[in-house]
Amino acid sequence: MTEIETMKDLSTCKDDWLKDAAKSADFTDDDTLLITIHRGAKQIGGSITEISMGRTAVLVDCGSELPGSQGSVRDEDIIKKIFCNRRRYTDHHLSGVLFTHYHGDHVGLMDRIPTDIPIYMDSATLTILRTLHKHTGNIAMQEMLSSGNERIRTFTPGKLLTIGDMNIIPFFVDHSAYHANMFLFESRITNHTVLHSGDFRSTGYMAKSLDIIPRLIHENYGKQVDVLLTEGTMMTRSTDAEHLLTEWDVKKEATNFMRDHRQIFVICSSTNFDSLTSFCNAARANKIPVYGNSYIIEMLKVFSDMAGKYTGLYGLPPIKGIDELKQARPKEGIVLLGSLLNRKNEDAYSLYDRYSHYMRDYKPHLIYSMWQGYLSPEHPAYDEGLATFVKRFGSSVKYIHSAGHADKAALAKFIEDVAPRKYIVPLHTKNAAGFKALPIEDKYKEMVILPDDGDRIGFR
């Protein structure tokens, strides 16, 4: 039996499946699976999902909103709802919070989680977050992530994790965050299963993982997925060629560009290891030295030490410090700048002037490798400081970027490969309804349900 209930007045709901929830249901029975979309049903970023099986409830991610977000639930309100007012609408105590990866829109509210609730992440994510927040000055995050904090617990992708009435299997998946994870949940009471996709894509160096995961679930573990919770970031974004570049394409384009332009700044997230690898190896192919500040150098060393153990793909050339750039004033060099988000205009100007004068001809080019929405004044996420910096280069800007999320074709293939049996619930998207128009079998289109933030989906 399936029932849906919501925190809002059900009489005003338009969807038939949601109106049916007006029938009273006992959502405290041990044989009931509950999924609560606290935030993410109608927005990108700030994702928080709750899964309850038996007497055990966990959150997946606890993220802050993205810059310029116009979501209906603010960070402060969501914290109060989940943690302060919790017992007003559920008897289930939270047994833990699991994090899919280290991006701020998935971990940004981690320091607001009550201290009696355990936190789970894989060891790579923990190492990266510790390195990141050593440089941010966020004391609360630094203390939470310290090695002496026993509430931080690590898991290993592919190995069973048991929390109360749940068995959980994490799966490594390709994303613009290194070592992102999907989670397969199984009730130890009813054997109901839920696959939470987290963020994923099919264009990175580890893209084969997207094909492997469904096979592992069905063949190695012998499981079928009842409910698929899947991201849909790209459902409202263009799918033209610039969004469909693979990391192999990024490396190829960068290699060709560097052949003709030997002094280049690169704007790319300092935690996007795949793309940083692409640019560093493109520079190596052209025998151009690579420079970065101490933060970039440390992050690349952390990434390379972890990933380099498994494949030579992530072996990087030596990265020189900015001081060496200043002293040498080279004729050629690739300078990794990070993302440059959230800077004031004057900071952007001074950074350009300082770094460009370290180059001999003072006419460097720029590779911009991030989402273009940050540069558009019409977009809520517009970053004036970043846009100011980019404008200084005029026509000497080259856009080379591989999207961090799955496009519609990849989403459709993933859904059919997973082959869920009951529901498909879109998350991390502004176009959940678009899932019904994906090129998937009709039976899967009929499984798509469109809850609002705060709705609870339950079945026995």
Task: Please report, for each region that a protein language model flagged, where it lies by residue.
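Short acidic loop-to-helix transition motifs that present clustered carboxylates
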Residues: D105, F155-L161, S176, N272, ...
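His/Asp/Glu-rich metal-coordinating catalytic cores
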Residues: E3-G96, D105-D274, S278, A285
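Metal-dependent phosphodiesterase/nuclease catalytic metal-binding core
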Residues: E50-R55, L59, N181-P420, Y444
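C-terminal structured "cap/appendage" subdomains that terminate the fold
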Residues: L411-A437
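Active-site microenvironment of metallo-dependent hydrolases
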Residues: H428-R460
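Short gly/pro/ser/thr-enriched loop/turn and capping motifs at secondary-structure boundaries
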Residues: L66-P67, L126-L129, T203, I297-L300, ...
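Conserved G/P- and acidic residue-centered "switch" motifs that form tight phosphate/ATP-binding loops
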Residues: H101
